[in-house]
Protein backbone atom coordinates (compact mmCIF):
# COMPACT_ATOMS: atom_id res chain seq x y z
CA UNK A 1 0.00 0.00 0.00
CA UNK A 2 1.38 3.40 -0.98
CA UNK A 3 2.04 5.62 1.98
CA UNK A 4 -0.02 8.78 2.37
CA UNK A 5 2.24 11.50 3.79
CA UNK A 6 0.97 14.41 5.87
CA UNK A 7 3.31 17.40 6.09
CA UNK A 8 3.55 18.30 9.79
CA UNK A 9 6.29 19.69 12.00
CA UNK A 10 6.82 16.26 13.57
CA UNK A 11 7.04 14.73 10.10
CA UNK A 12 9.72 17.21 9.05
CA UNK A 13 11.68 16.57 12.26
CA UNK A 14 11.38 12.84 11.55
CA UNK A 15 13.49 13.29 8.44
CA UNK A 16 16.36 14.28 10.73
CA UNK A 17 16.02 11.00 12.66
CA UNK A 18 16.08 9.06 9.40
CA UNK A 19 19.33 10.80 8.46
CA UNK A 20 20.77 9.81 11.85
CA UNK A 21 19.90 6.16 11.17
CA UNK A 22 21.52 6.28 7.75
CA UNK A 23 24.57 8.00 9.24
CA UNK A 24 24.98 5.30 11.91
CA UNK A 25 24.68 2.54 9.30
CA UNK A 26 27.27 4.27 7.12
CA UNK A 27 29.72 4.80 9.99
CA UNK A 28 29.56 1.20 11.21
CA UNK A 29 29.84 -0.17 7.67
CA UNK A 30 32.77 2.11 6.86
CA UNK A 31 34.61 1.09 10.04
CA UNK A 32 34.25 -2.59 9.11
CA UNK A 33 35.43 -2.06 5.56
CA UNK A 34 38.47 -0.08 6.77
CA UNK A 35 39.72 -3.26 8.39
CA UNK A 36 38.55 -5.96 5.98
CA UNK A 37 39.66 -4.28 2.75
CA UNK A 38 43.20 -5.18 3.85
CA UNK A 39 42.26 -8.87 4.18
CA UNK A 40 40.23 -9.53 1.03
CA UNK A 41 42.45 -12.44 -0.02
CA UNK A 42 41.50 -14.38 3.09
CA UNK A 43 38.64 -16.85 2.46
CA UNK A 44 37.18 -16.36 5.93
CA UNK A 45 37.09 -12.59 5.35
CA UNK A 46 35.37 -13.10 2.01
CA UNK A 47 32.73 -15.32 3.63
CA UNK A 48 32.19 -12.83 6.46
CA UNK A 49 31.77 -9.91 4.07
CA UNK A 50 29.36 -11.88 1.88
CA UNK A 51 27.10 -12.71 4.84
CA UNK A 52 27.41 -9.17 6.21
CA UNK A 53 26.44 -7.55 2.92
CA UNK A 54 23.43 -9.86 2.57
CA UNK A 55 22.27 -8.99 6.08
CA UNK A 56 22.90 -5.30 5.46
CA UNK A 57 20.90 -5.39 2.24
CA UNK A 58 17.94 -6.95 4.07
CA UNK A 59 18.29 -4.34 6.83
CA UNK A 60 18.11 -1.45 4.35
CA UNK A 61 15.23 -3.13 2.47
CA UNK A 62 13.16 -3.68 5.62
CA UNK A 63 13.96 -0.14 6.79
CA UNK A 64 12.69 1.28 3.49
CA UNK A 65 9.56 -0.90 3.61
CA UNK A 66 8.75 0.08 7.20
CA UNK A 67 9.28 3.75 6.37
CA UNK A 68 7.47 3.90 3.02
CA UNK A 69 4.57 1.47 3.56
CA UNK A 70 1.32 3.11 4.63
CA UNK A 71 0.44 1.68 8.07
CA UNK A 72 -3.25 1.67 7.18
CA UNK A 73 -6.17 4.07 7.15
CA UNK A 74 -9.84 3.67 8.02
CA UNK A 75 -11.89 2.50 5.00
CA UNK A 76 -14.40 5.10 3.72
CA UNK A 77 -17.82 4.97 5.40
CA UNK A 78 -16.65 2.36 7.92
CA UNK A 79 -18.88 2.21 11.01
CA UNK A 80 -21.88 4.14 9.71
CA UNK A 81 -24.09 1.11 10.29
CA UNK A 82 -23.05 0.47 13.90
CA UNK A 83 -26.23 0.17 15.95
CA UNK A 84 -24.90 1.45 19.28
CA UNK A 85 -25.04 5.26 19.11
CA UNK A 86 -22.97 5.63 22.31
CA UNK A 87 -20.22 3.45 20.83
CA UNK A 88 -20.33 5.48 17.62
CA UNK A 89 -19.87 8.66 19.64
CA UNK A 90 -16.89 7.28 21.52
CA UNK A 91 -15.21 5.89 18.40
CA UNK A 92 -15.64 8.98 16.23
CA UNK A 93 -12.52 11.01 15.41
CA UNK A 94 -13.33 14.72 15.28
CA UNK A 95 -10.13 15.48 13.37
CA UNK A 96 -10.36 12.84 10.63
CA UNK A 97 -14.19 12.65 10.67
CA UNK A 98 -14.23 8.84 10.63
CA UNK A 99 -15.44 6.10 12.95
CA UNK A 100 -12.41 4.31 14.38
CA UNK A 101 -12.27 0.50 14.57
CA UNK A 102 -10.74 -1.16 17.61
CA UNK A 103 -7.00 -0.41 18.01
CA UNK A 104 -7.29 2.48 15.60
CA UNK A 105 -5.85 5.69 17.04
CA UNK A 106 -5.26 9.23 15.85
CA UNK A 107 -1.56 10.04 15.57
CA UNK A 108 -0.78 13.71 16.18
CA UNK A 109 2.60 13.34 14.46
CA UNK A 110 1.09 11.95 11.25
CA UNK A 111 -2.14 13.96 11.67
CA UNK A 112 -4.30 10.97 10.76
CA UNK A 113 -5.98 7.86 12.16
CA UNK A 114 -3.91 4.68 11.87
CA UNK A 115 -5.29 1.14 11.72
CA UNK A 116 -4.05 -1.20 14.47
CA UNK A 117 -1.61 1.48 15.60
CA UNK A 118 1.28 0.23 17.72
CA UNK A 119 3.24 3.47 18.10
CA UNK A 120 4.74 6.32 16.13
CA UNK A 121 8.42 5.65 15.44
CA UNK A 122 10.51 8.74 14.60
CA UNK A 123 13.42 6.53 13.50
CA UNK A 124 11.42 5.41 10.46
CA UNK A 125 9.43 8.67 10.36
CA UNK A 126 6.21 6.68 10.22
CA UNK A 127 3.61 5.01 12.39
CA UNK A 128 3.84 1.28 13.00
CA UNK A 129 0.43 -0.10 12.14
CA UNK A 130 -1.55 -2.80 10.36
CA UNK A 131 0.32 -2.94 7.06
CA UNK A 132 3.91 -2.22 8.08
CA UNK A 133 4.28 -3.85 11.50
CA UNK A 134 5.76 -6.98 9.91
CA UNK A 135 8.39 -4.84 8.16
CA UNK A 136 9.15 -3.13 11.47
CA UNK A 137 9.73 -6.51 13.14
CA UNK A 138 11.89 -7.62 10.21
CA UNK A 139 13.88 -4.41 10.60
CA UNK A 140 14.60 -5.24 14.24
CA UNK A 141 15.64 -8.78 13.28
CA UNK A 142 18.08 -7.63 10.61
CA UNK A 143 19.47 -4.84 12.80
CA UNK A 144 20.23 -7.45 15.46
CA UNK A 145 21.70 -9.87 12.94
CA UNK A 146 23.89 -7.20 11.36
CA UNK A 147 25.12 -5.73 14.64
CA UNK A 148 25.90 -9.19 16.03
CA UNK A 149 27.81 -10.05 12.85
CA UNK A 150 29.84 -6.85 13.10
CA UNK A 151 30.55 -7.48 16.78
CA UNK A 152 31.65 -11.05 16.06
CA UNK A 153 33.84 -10.04 13.13
CA UNK A 154 35.42 -6.97 14.72
CA UNK A 155 36.02 -7.93 18.37
CA UNK A 156 39.46 -9.48 17.87
CA UNK A 157 40.65 -6.86 15.33
CA UNK A 158 39.63 -4.07 17.72
CA UNK A 159 41.27 -5.86 20.64
CA UNK A 160 44.52 -6.19 18.69
CA UNK A 161 44.24 -2.57 17.58
CA UNK A 162 43.85 -1.36 21.17
CA UNK A 163 46.85 -3.43 22.23
CA UNK A 164 48.91 -1.87 19.45
CA UNK A 165 47.77 1.60 20.50
CA UNK A 166 48.77 0.82 24.08
CA UNK A 167 52.27 -0.17 22.96
CA UNK A 168 52.54 2.58 20.34
CA UNK A 169 50.23 5.41 21.51
CA UNK A 170 51.12 7.71 18.64
CA UNK A 171 48.31 7.67 16.03
CA UNK A 172 49.39 8.62 12.52
CA UNK A 173 46.03 8.34 10.72
CA UNK A 174 42.28 8.32 11.34
CA UNK A 175 41.64 4.60 10.74
CA UNK A 176 42.11 3.32 14.32
CA UNK A 177 39.80 6.03 15.67
CA UNK A 178 37.03 5.27 13.16
CA UNK A 179 37.31 1.52 13.65
CA UNK A 180 37.06 1.77 17.45
CA UNK A 181 34.20 4.30 17.29
CA UNK A 182 32.29 2.18 14.78
CA UNK A 183 32.74 -0.93 16.93
CA UNK A 184 31.65 0.85 20.13
CA UNK A 185 28.58 2.26 18.39
CA UNK A 186 27.72 -1.19 17.03
CA UNK A 187 27.94 -2.86 20.45
CA UNK A 188 25.82 -0.12 22.02
CA UNK A 189 23.22 -0.43 19.28
CA UNK A 190 23.15 -4.23 19.62
CA UNK A 191 22.43 -3.95 23.34
CA UNK A 192 19.66 -1.37 22.98
CA UNK A 193 17.93 -3.10 20.06
CA UNK A 194 18.12 -6.47 21.86
CA UNK A 195 15.97 -5.12 24.69
CA UNK A 196 13.68 -3.32 22.25
CA UNK A 197 13.23 -6.47 20.14
CA UNK A 198 12.47 -8.54 23.24
CA UNK A 199 9.73 -6.07 24.19
CA UNK A 200 8.13 -6.10 20.74
CA UNK A 201 8.43 -9.87 20.45
CA UNK A 202 6.45 -10.10 23.69
CA UNK A 203 3.81 -7.75 22.25
CA UNK A 204 3.44 -9.85 19.11
CA UNK A 205 3.29 -13.13 21.04
CA UNK A 206 0.57 -11.77 23.36
CA UNK A 207 -1.37 -10.06 20.55
CA UNK A 208 -1.14 -6.59 22.04
CA UNK A 209 0.31 -3.19 21.12
CA UNK A 210 2.59 -0.60 22.66
CA UNK A 211 -0.32 1.81 23.13
CA UNK A 212 -2.36 -0.79 25.02
CA UNK A 213 0.65 -1.56 27.22
CA UNK A 214 1.20 2.13 27.96
CA UNK A 215 -2.51 2.61 28.72
CA UNK A 216 -2.29 -0.16 31.31
CA UNK A 217 0.77 1.57 32.77
CA UNK A 218 -1.21 4.77 33.30
CA UNK A 219 -0.63 6.89 30.21
CA UNK A 220 -3.42 9.22 29.20
CA UNK A 221 -5.84 7.90 26.55
CA UNK A 222 -5.01 9.21 23.11
CA UNK A 223 -1.43 10.11 24.02
CA UNK A 224 0.91 9.40 21.11
CA UNK A 225 3.46 6.74 21.97
CA UNK A 226 6.74 6.88 20.10
CA UNK A 227 10.11 5.17 20.29
List each model region and its residues.
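Membrane-associated feature with strongest affinity for ZDHHC
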Residues: 1-227
Amino acid sequence: MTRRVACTQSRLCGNFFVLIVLGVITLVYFSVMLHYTEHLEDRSSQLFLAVLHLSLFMLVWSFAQAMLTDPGEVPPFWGFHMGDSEQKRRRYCLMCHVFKPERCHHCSACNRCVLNMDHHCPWINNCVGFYNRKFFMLLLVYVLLTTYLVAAGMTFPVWNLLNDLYVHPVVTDYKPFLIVCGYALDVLLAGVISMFFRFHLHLVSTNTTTIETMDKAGHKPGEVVST
